[in-house]
Amino acid sequence: MQPLVEALAGEYQQRHPNFALDITAGGSLVGIQAVQEGQVDIGMASRALKAGEQEAGMQLFTIAYDALVIITHPSNPIKAVSLEELQAIYSGEITNWSALGGLDLAIEVVARELSSGTRGAFDEIVLGNATLKPEATVVATAGEVETNISKHAGAIGYVGFGNLPPTVTVVAIDGVSPTPESILNDSYRLKRPLSLLVGPLSRTQAHDFIAFANSQAGQSLISQGGWVAIKPAQ
């Protein structure tokens, strides 16, 4: 979410020159905990609050939608899988692309680290009660996912819709490709909210920044940046 919030902060600071916003990325878990402890005014989260995180005074505001986009090496002929097949790949039940009608090539699974909101959303939507295969390559950033995919013909990974690199193949899920339209109408099933979080110790201007993010100007910036705005353009 960092590039999204940086774009919003740049425009907000032009309108409010005395406003200073320091942005640090560390995953949704870090952001949520920092707001809970009063270390920051605003947290970034790309997943819903868990039961233990829903403390009194914590408020989550969705400002955009994103999709988890499944990507593979450009040489991979498989262009679509089902959600069930994707779960089987990441749990280790399916280990070779030939099982899906592809090349006789071992599948190399790439996942994000546990503190990542992207990982949390993927585990919830795709893995469910299954567990990630122990042999998976776990990386910290979307850029590292792309690097691994580009170097390994059998690799599969996931990135956010707003972080989609041009050098990979996008894999459709249940026959539906990720587009702004399919994300908004829920036909693309790997969807997640991008939200800002405030707590009882957050200062007033934190709420004003969130109001800007959900304004027409803020939503326009979100669309221009490649994410899916929650409010259609007027």
Predicted feature residues:
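Exported/periplasmic ABC-transporter solute-binding proteins
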Residues: 1-234
